[in-house]
Amino acid sequence: MADFGKEAVAIEVHGVSKSFLNAEGGSFKALDEVSFAIPKGSLAVVSGQNGSGKSLLMTIIAGLEKPASGYIRTNSKVGLVFQDADSQILGETPLEDVCFGLSNTGVRGSRAKDAASKALKKVGLYEKRNSPSHFLSGGEKRRLAIASILAMGFETIIMDEPYSNLDYAGVKDVNRLIGDLSASGVTLVILTHEIEKCLALANKFMVLKKGCLVFDGTPLAGLSLGAETWEDWGIRNPLLSYPTLDSLVWK
């Protein structure tokens, strides 16, 4: 049971299910009785094949979807960084973009600019605060989305496929920020099938398969399971290409 009185748990998911209609007029379970807890300050990596339910689960946690059954409890505001970071950028410059998000919470004027500047410094974009947003690289756009979330006081951040379409330098920049945020106590949940790029940063690893949570443990425990288990999950054990858990991070 999550101990919210002591603020030990950032996210508690209990018995969450969600169904949708299929082409034949029946229904299928996109999520099936999923339960887990993520301790406050953790860095959790969630993996699984496309269609496993991981993105749907996280939109439910962020409050953008409702479960058909079960419940979600969070101990702080949860921000979601979408795979397509462009969809979250509404300002013509990074400073305008972060201020726009703050304006929706009632923070405007000099207070908004101060908070936005602080957040942009934290993600390494302050020097580009007045540059056109559309000129930012893919990694910079993800950092801008994170800056907007930080400025609004979110203490838990979910990132959906944060390495999608990034080159090596972009991955390193995102991982550097992930490491800094984790060290500062922010709870992070990373949804990715590219676990070789970040698993060494994590202290929690979960795998979804066809809407079911099939593994919930430490990265080392998951990596120690046999090849048949990974084949059943439909994802590739990165230790087939990398020597140790410590090497599973691009930096």
Predicted regions and their residues:
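The feature captures the beta-strand-to-loop junction immediately N-terminal to the Walker
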Residues: S47-Q49
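Conserved ABC ATPase "signature" region
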Residues: S110-K128
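Catalytic Walker B motif of ABC-type/P-loop ATPase nucleotide-binding domains
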Residues: I157-D160
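H-loop/switch region of ABC-family ATPase nucleotide-binding domains
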Residues: T192-H193
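ABC ATPase nucleotide-binding domains
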Residues: S224-K251
